[in-house]
UniProtKB/Swiss-Prot annotation:
Pathway: Amine and polyamine biosynthesis; spermidine biosynthesis; spermidine from putrescine: step 1/1
Domain of life the protein comes from: Bacteria
Domain PABS residue range list: 9-242
This enzyme's EC code(s): 2.5.1.16
Entry protein name: Polyamine aminopropyltransferase
Known partners and oligomeric status: Homodimer or homotetramer.
Any one cellular-component term (Gene Ontology): cytoplasm
Role played: Catalyzes the irreversible transfer of a propylamine group from the amino donor S-adenosylmethioninamine (decarboxy-AdoMet) to putrescine (1,4-diaminobutane) to yield spermidine.
Amino acid sequence: MNYKLKTRSEWLDEYHQGVRYGLQGKLILEESSPFQKITIYESKRYGKALLLDDCWMTAEKSEKCYHECLIHPALCCSTQIENILIIGGGDGGSARECLKYKEVKSIDLVEIDLRVIELSQKYLPTIGGDAWSDSRLNLQIKNGIDWVKHTQENSYDVIIIDGADPIGPSKELFSNSFLKDCKRILKQGGVLATQSESPESFQKIHINIVKVLREIFDYADPMYGSVSIYPSGLWSWTFASMKQQRYMHPKKSRVKEISENCQIWSTRWQQGAFNSIPAFIERELAKK
């Protein structure tokens, strides 16, 4: 992936494979942590935004299009949801969505870069919301790969992989060995959820993620939606489970509990998102 970020007057642009994505606004902060370049930008259209290594990660007024779609197909459908693992997710949005469920007793949020959390809390506090002060949230400033590798089997009901694009510290979150470890520590009846890139801008990566998950788990299926600040605007999330497609069957009690507080996700939306797989992707996934 060839990313390049440039500023032209009041615009901040992300260049990717001959396409330019830009938001108008002003630069607030730019620094380098031990792991990556971090940028905070205030856009006129989407509010404050977070960029990592010059890639748009999240923005105040568009983040629900991403976080609700990553979290609720997993938590509404998993057999149990008491113990949750989030890898990445330093902006707090995934934790916020998980904590909408009263059944959730504990969330381990494993983020490698403390500065992502600190700057998100300071400049984008509405994304994490009350999650940061919720006693059920346990912050672990550690390497997610190592955390999963050294965790006992059958430890979590749901695993959420909320990493950046497969460059920098997030690259190994898409590896075969890491996903096998995730399967090992996921309880029977559990669901794994991961962002799985754009089927248009990152076609090969997207297809590979789904295929690897299908090799490791009994079932894995992508769903598709719109995240306007990401390359092409078309994004995907992939869900995996054993024995049955648990992520296809939301539990009515959980739907009732959280649906009124969702802006994007609904059972109807979820069904449509799973059914909206592009034909060319479906053909590629069918190839051996």
